Swiss-Prot record:
Molecular function, one GO term: heme binding
Family statement drawn from the similarity comment of this UniProt entry: Belongs to the cytochrome c family.
Keywords: Electron transport, Heme, Iron, Metal-binding, Mitochondrion, Respiratory chain, Transport
Role summary: Electron carrier protein. The oxidized form of the cytochrome c heme group can accept an electron from the heme group of the cytochrome c1 subunit of cytochrome reductase. Cytochrome c then transfers this electron to the cytochrome oxidase complex, the final protein carrier in the mitochondrial electron-transport chain.
Binding site for heme c: C19, C22, H23, M85
Compartments where located: Mitochondrion intermembrane space
Protein name per UniProt: Cytochrome c
GO cellular component, one term: mitochondrial intermembrane space
PROSITE patterns xrefs: CYTC
One Pfam family named in its UniProt record: Cytochrom_C
Chief location bin: mitochondrion
Membrane-spanning segments: none
Modification note: Binds 1 heme c group covalently per subunit.
Length: 108
């Protein structure tokens, strides 16, 4: 299947509208309801220092990359049953691709 090439600006709009209530992306950003996402790519689930993850997130044991995020963002509660993330997901592949493109640029 593969992750569609995303548009960073469209992804930023999605992040602001759907994610920023609970997440930050900048280096040293505070955890909110959800963890700060800086350094997300290449990190295992449940590993942002200082955030209280559910056992389900800690036990999932996958590494975040384009493919794992693409699947997770479609339906987070299906991908990690027991996660406390209340977001229902992004059903449209192009929206997930846009968001992933933004996250890749914003969380380095």
């Amino acid at each position: 299947m593969g992750v569609p090439a995303g548009d960073v600006e469209k992804g930023k709009k999605i992040f602001v509208q759907r994610c920023a209530q609970c997440h930050t992306v900048e280096a040293g950003g505070k955890h909110k309801v959800g963890p700060n996402l800086h350094g997300l790519f290449g990190r295992k689930t449940g590993q942002a220092p200082g955030f209280a993850y559910t056992d389900a997130n800690k036990a999932k044991g996958i590494t975040w990359n384009e493919d794992t995020l693409f699947e997770y963002l479609e339906n987070p509660k299906k991908y990690i049953p027991g996660t406390k993330m209340i977001f229902a997901g992004l059903k449209k592949p192009n929206e997930r691709g846009d968001l992933i493109a933004y996250l890749k640029s914003a969380t380095k």
